[in-house]
């Protein structure tokens, strides 16, 4: 039976009749013995926004903030916190740490005692931050001001990627991998001569066809424009694959990976998303790859309109918000596809 909205009395529920569930309704279920019963409240909630739309919210707009002064930057989401690493024009290295639930970007902490700290190299691996300072691998437990050198003789031109069990670095045109940051081994690549060391970004994503498979996509600048690499991984450890170079050939036309400044790469809604700017400091449309780095299509995902960008940092937090942090203006946006908030 169901409680009547007009009388407040129980009435027999008829499945073939229409029932008003615009407000919570009390439904009573009776057992076959005619004695036992249990009452439930049925509350049907309808999501009234377009599930596939993405709206951007401006979180900060302070041209006097520390992040506005960065000329190089990198953002990471770790747990419920955002870390924005930046370098100022005078070479000072800083980091802004803030909670995603109540984000503030006005003040930064100086990272002191290190020369040539490469903010674009910062990675998070197995509970530690890693970065390069003058080619030397350094690490920190907090990402703030406790950086120390890692005990390894290996020096690097770039830190390339992080997956579940390994961190990857590029040195002298070769790819290296480590499970602990100290012992490094060569990692196989299928093509020589195209490993990027500048303007480099990576992301990882789950395979659409193999529950035990995932992959890393890496992009960066090389002599020919933008280099794109992919490596497949098997979570069971049964198979091993090399890093594969994905040539951005002429026949790709407008779907080739664009040559951008301030490159960022992230995974969102099952696709690989490329963000960046023109050399004049205008944020370009997001480029989406649904074939793991082979082709790139613009404007599949809405993006904020930004100009005057000196450095751009983009990351995705645990709540599926995309954060876009613009140095030069101090503007910060966040946005999320509505249905991802619904837990799809």
Regions found by a protein language model. Give the residues of each.
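Beta-propeller fold detector
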Residues: 52-63, 103-114, 147-154, 185-193, ...
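Repeated scaffold domains used in trafficking and secretory/extracellular systems
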Residues: 63-76, 110-127, 149-166, 191-211, ...
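Beta-strand-rich domains and repeat architectures in extracellular enzymes and scaffolds
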Residues: 59-91
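Conserved Ser/Thr-centered positions that define the repeating blades of beta-propeller domains
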Residues: 96-101, 139-141, 177-179, 230-232, ...
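Loop/turn-rich, solvent-exposed surfaces of beta-rich toroidal or solenoidal domains
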Residues: 253-290
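Entry beta-strands of beta-propeller and related beta-repeat scaffolds
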Residues: 79-84, 127-131, 165-169, 211-218, ...
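Blade-level signature of beta-propeller repeat domains, shared across WD40, Kelch, NHL, RCC1
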Residues: 294-299, 306-344
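Beta-rich interaction/scaffold domains
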Residues: 1-71, 340-344
């Amino acid at each position: 039976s169901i409680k009547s909205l007009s009388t407040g009395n129980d009435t027999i529920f008829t499945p073939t009749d229409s029932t008003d569930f615009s407000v919570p309704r009390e439904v009573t279920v009776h057992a076959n013995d005619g004695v036992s019963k249990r009452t439930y409240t049925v509350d049907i909630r309808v999501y009234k926004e377009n599930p596939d739309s993405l709206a951007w919210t401006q979180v900060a707009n302070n041209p006097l903030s520390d992040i506005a002064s960065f000329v190089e930057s990198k953002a990471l989401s770790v747990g419920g916190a955002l870390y924005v690493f930046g370098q100022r024009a005078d070479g000072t290295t800083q980091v802004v740490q803030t909670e995603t639930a109540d984000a503030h970007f006005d003040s930064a902490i100086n990272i002191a005692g290190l020369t040539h700290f490469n903010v674009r190299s910062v990675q998070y691996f197995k509970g530690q931050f890693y970065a390069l300072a003058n080619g030397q691998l350094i690490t920190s437990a907090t990402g703030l001001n406790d950086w120390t050198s890692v005990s390894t003789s290996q020096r690097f031109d770039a830190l390339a990627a992080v997956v579940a069990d390994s961190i990857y670095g590029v040195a002298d045109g070769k790819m290296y991998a480590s499970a602990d940051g100290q012992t490094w081994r060569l990692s196989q690549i299928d093509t020589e001569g195209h490993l990027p060391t500048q303007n480099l970004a990576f992301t990882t994503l789950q395979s659409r066809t193999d529950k035990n498979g995932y992959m890393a996509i890496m992009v960066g600048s090389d002599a020919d424009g933008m280099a794109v690499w992919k490596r497949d991984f098997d979570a069971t450890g049964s198979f091993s694959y090399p890093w594969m170079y994905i040539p951005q050939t002429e026949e790709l036309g407008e779907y080739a990976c664009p040559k951008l400044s301030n490159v960022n790469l992230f995974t969102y809604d099952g696709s690989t998303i490329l963000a960046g700017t023109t050399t004049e400091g205008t944020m370009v449309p997001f480029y989406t790859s649904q074939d793991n780095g082979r082709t790139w299509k613009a404007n599949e995902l809405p993006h904020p309109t930004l100009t005057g960008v000196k450095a751009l940092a983009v990351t995705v937090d645990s709540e599926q918000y995309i954060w876009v942090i613009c140095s030069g203006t101090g503007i910060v946006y966040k946005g999320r596809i509505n249905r991802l908030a619904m837990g799809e």
